[in-house]
Design a protein with these regions (language model features):
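Adenylate-forming
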Residues: 2, 29, 33-36, 47-69, ...
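Nucleotide phosphate-binding site architecture
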Residues: 2, 10, 21, 29, ...
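Conserved AMP-binding/adenylation subdomain of ANL enzymes
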Residues: 2-41, 56
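Conserved AMP-binding/adenylate-forming
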Residues: 18, 68-70, 77-95, 99-186
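Helix N-cap/beta->alpha junction signal
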Residues: 24, 46-47, 74, 164
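Short, hinge-like loop/turn segments at secondary-structure boundaries
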Residues: 38-41, 60-64, 109-114
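Short, Asp-centered acidic motifs that coordinate Mg2+ and/or phosphate
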Residues: 41-42, 69
Length: 187
C-alpha cells in the first residue's frame, strides 16, 4: 500500500467511511473481480498495473462499472494507456509524489475542454504536472544552484521543490542528507 498505490488513500477512504480493498498480488482478474464485487470507485497504481488492465483479455473486462477513478504515478501515462482506460470507462489522473512529501504532491489538473482533443494531445497534456496538491503549502520548479524559479517555457530544466507541513522533517540519523535536501528551506 505504498509505492504508486496512494498511501494517502487508506486515510482518505476511512475519513469518507469507505472500504479499502487490498489484494495480495497484482493480477488483472483479481483487480477486475474486486472492482465488480466490492464496487471499487477509486484506485491507484503504477503504470505497469494500468497497462496490465488495459491489455487484459476482453472477457475479464465484461460487466465493469464505468466512472472508476484511477491515479497513475511513477511515469507519465502514454496515449495508449489513456485511450485503453477510457475504453473501459475509467478516468485516469496523473499524479506525482515521493515518500518525503507524502504524495501525491502534484496533480495534473485536467480541463473539461481536453475531452474534445484527440488522444495524442490529451496524452501530452496529461503527462504534465505542476498543480500542487492542496495539502502542500508550495511547489515550485527552481534552479538548484541559484534557488530561483526557472522560466515556465517547457524547456528550461529545474528541480521541483516543496514546502509544507507534510514534507518530512529529515532523514533518520542522517543530518547531512537532511541539510542537503532542505537547502534554501525547500525540499
Amino acid at each position: 500500500m505504498f509505492h504508486c498505490n496512494g498511501w494517502c488513500f487508506p486515510w482518505t477512504v476511512a475519513a469518507r467511511a469507505g472500504v479499502n480493498v487490498c489484494l495480495r498480488r497484482v493480477d488483472a482478474k483479481a483487480i477486475f473481480d474486486a472492482i465488480r464485487q466490492h464496487g471499487v470507485t477509486h484506485y491507484c497504481g503504477a503504470p505497469i498495473v494500468h497497462g496490465l488492465l488495459v491489455n487484459a483479455p476482453a472477457a475479464l473486462k465484461e460487466g465493469l462499472p464505468t466512472g472508476v477513478k484511477a491515479m497513475v504515478a511513477g511515469a507519465a501515462p502514454p496515449a495508449s494507456m489513456i485511450e485503453g482506460m477510457e475504453q473501459m470507462g475509467f478516468d485516469l489522473t496523473h499524479v506525482y509524489g515521493l515518500t518525503e512529501v507524502y504524495g501525491p504532491a502534484t496533480v495534473c489538473a485536467k480541463h473539461a475542454a481536453w475531452d474534445q482533443l484527440d488522444i495524442g494531445e490529451r496524452a501530452r497534456l496529461n503527462a504534465r504536472q505542476g498543480v500542487r496538491y492542496h495539502l502542500q503549502r508550495a511547489a515550485q520548479v527552481l534552479n538548484p544552484d541559484t534557488m530561483q524559479p526557472v522560466p515556465q517555457d517547457g524547456e528550461t530544466m529545474g528541480e521541483i521543490m516543496f514546502r509544507g507541513n507534510i514534507a518530512m522533517k529529515g532523514y533518520l540519523k542522517n543530518p547531512q542528507a537532511t541539510q542537503d535536501a532542505f537547502r534554501g528551506g525547500w525540499f
